[in-house]
């Protein structure tokens, strides 16, 4: 998406994934941790004036609550099963009152939730038979509320280990 935005003249020097992976325009948008560390070390070296790495993220807002649940897929063909779960979630979320599917998303299904002042992202892991579920909310108890609703949907899939969501109701 960052490449497309830049081609349209939108200044987009960095692409970030929910997992924390990042890619810089000046490194051809390669997901390169060594390059990122080199950039951070340069900033540390420049910090001789008393500034520090934390200053780079001053002003970024943090949600009141945030949680990641890592849901294991127990089916042998975990990739196809995960794709099915995401497809069904996309269909379900599009019809559910108070849920708004984020159209410009490239990592699974992201849904904004009215009332919880938050959102969730459910996606496939790139490497493991996992479906990470990230939830953020700006109201007390919002993560729990969103997780309970998502779990209600996921209960229909016998090929998911919903243990990480146990205790949510």
Where are these regions (language model features)?
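Phosphate-binding and adjacent anionic-ligand microenvironments
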Residues: 1-134, 139-169
């Amino acid at each position: 998406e960052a490449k497309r935005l830049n081609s349209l003249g939108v200044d987009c020097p960095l692409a970030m994934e929910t997992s924390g992976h990042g890619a810089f325009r000046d490194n051809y948008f390669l997901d390169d941790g060594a390059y990122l560390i080199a950039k951070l070390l340069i900033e540390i070296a420049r910090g001789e004036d008393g500034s520090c790495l934390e200053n780079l993220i001053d002003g970024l807002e943090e949600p009141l609550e945030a949680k990641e649940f890592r849901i294991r897929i127990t089916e042998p063909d975990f990739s196809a099963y995960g794709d099915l779960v995401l497809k069904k979630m996309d269909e379900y979320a599009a019809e559910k009152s108070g849920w708004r599917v984020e159209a410009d998303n490239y990592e699974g299904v992201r849904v904004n939730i009215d009332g919880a002042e938050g959102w969730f992202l459910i996606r496939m892991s790139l490497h493991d038979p996992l479906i990470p579920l990230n939830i953020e909310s700006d109201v007390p108890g919002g993560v729990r509320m969103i997780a309970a609703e998502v779990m209600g949907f996921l209960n229909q899939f016998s090929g998911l280990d919903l243990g990480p969501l146990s205790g949510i109701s």
